[in-house]
């Protein structure tokens, strides 16, 4: 065990984490030169395109150190984006050390800090690395002082490197071997292995990525999941080098995979402990008595409705979501029915990027055509009888008379930016009802801390933050508490009928404005009918905005040249009566763009 090192790489998006991983794999001969490609650990197309890492991947490498010994290095790649922080904490809990990669030309950014704190909380040894030293504008001294100021770890011997040119790779490998501790665990004890990740493979079923803490696992042994109690045969075990390399056994301290012919992913929950079954007890007794401390269940923060464009596609959307859930344990979904859109699902996501990626994967990998409703957050509603209920969907909000208060989720937001953009960012945060808690200068970087309602962030805060700061600002947020607030539900009515999928929950101060904006946007989108269509925005029974789409009508007076006015009146009255009758039985089709229009209403 003394020759094993488990480590991961922490970095902000685009600071060169995946490229550094490629270099380490290449240097240790993990893949043949011809198999080497850029971002070898990012296996999804969407990861390569967006240049982000979503799923954690692993690689087992052999490194011959300068002291002549051969070490087994297990690299566990982590995502950098704040939406995937759950994947990060899982990856880190399987490691003893982490490389903190900071772009020497940009310095420390928000998500680096968030993930680094996660690592320090888990007691992981952090080794700072300054990447992109080959750039002409690299400023290692500034980056070092930022690491010390913002994160508070000693960066005097941070290793300068360039993942692109290969500079400093050997120094990094030496630091991994000498600075990071060997795994702790009892190699002779009963088997306990933690499931770090699991995903579904169409050929072999569920593949579990495990970190063996105590004991050893031999191919073909009977294993048991401690949380679910399910039992299987470990048919195939091995390690990823990133390619699969089957092994006869996995020892304590190693990170590898188990394939046990599991059909449904619920059986192999991430964070569960795998142990052996004592031979001869018929599966009654497991060898280990207590499970490893798992991970906390993650709560989705953002909810949206996903509906198939064709009602007949409902079943295939359900299958697609089930398959996606196999690879993404943080996705939540449940069926829901909307009068406007038919049958679909209410899905819970960790954040906006997560939502976008799930949507894109559904469309790309499973050929789904989707209608997505506006994202919303979970509100706490206190009823008149004192009962507290959680409302995920605006259309499920009780009537105004039946509740005493609504509490909205408040998050603490950390914003990092160069000091010339502070004014613009502060203005934006104030527009979003943010309350400034703190402001700190670190060299030329400024860190602002705000408390803001999550509902204000989910729509477009991130996009606007990037545009007011020309892309330099970065943010992360964590949930703080629920707080009573004056928020109201705005319903959109078409000819007096509520369209449930268009309801939005907004602060009262913005309700009039938002209502008017949505209504006028809808007027542009809905095509003219044979009868007048009234589009209204209402809070409870009070109408706050209205637009009318005038009817298409034939000129019934075209055939009257001269003649008496009463003749013309009669024809007009007759047309009017027909339109009125049509309006009673006619229905208005709401096009897909109308649901997206809500997302584009500017503040």
Curated annotation (Swiss-Prot):
This protein's major location comes to membrane
Question: Per the UniProt record, which EC number(s) apply here?
Answer: 3.6.5.n1
User: Does the record's keyword annotation contain Lipid metabolism?
Assistant: no
The entry's GTP-binding residues are: 14-19, 131-134
Which protein are we looking at? Answer: Elongation factor 4
Statement: the UniProt record of this protein carries the keyword Cell cycle = no
Q: What does this protein do?
A: Required for accurate and efficient protein synthesis under certain stress conditions. May act as a fidelity factor of the translation reaction, by catalyzing a one-codon backward translocation of tRNAs on improperly translocated ribosomes. Back-translocation proceeds from a post-translocation (POST) complex to a pre-translocation (PRE) complex, thus giving elongation factor G a second chance to translocate the tRNAs correctly. Binds to ribosomes in a GTP-dependent manner.
How does it sit in the bilayer?
A: Peripheral membrane protein
An example of a Gene Ontology cellular component annotation for this protein is: plasma membrane
GO biological process terms held by the UniProt record: positive regulation of translation
- Family that this chain belongs to: Belongs to the TRAFAC class translation factor GTPase superfamily. Classic translation factor GTPase family. LepA subfamily.
NCBIfam families given in the database record: lepA, small_GTP
EC category: hydrolase
Q: Which residues form the tr-type G domain?
A: 2-184
**What keywords were assigned to this record?**
Cell inner membrane, Cell membrane, GTP-binding, Hydrolase, Membrane, Nucleotide-binding, Protein biosynthesis
Q: Which Gene3D superfamilies match?
A: 3.30.70.240, Elongation factor 4, C-terminal domain, Elongation Factor G (Translational Gtpase), domain 3, P-loop containing nucleotide triphosphate hydrolases, Translation factors
Subcellular location per UniProt equals:
Cell inner membrane
Record Pfam families: EFG_C (PF00679), GTP_EFTU (PF00009), GTP_EFTU_D2 (PF03144), LepA_C (PF06421)
> What CDD domains does the database record attribute to this sequence?
EF4_III, LepA, lepA_C
Q: Name the gene for this chain.
A: lepA
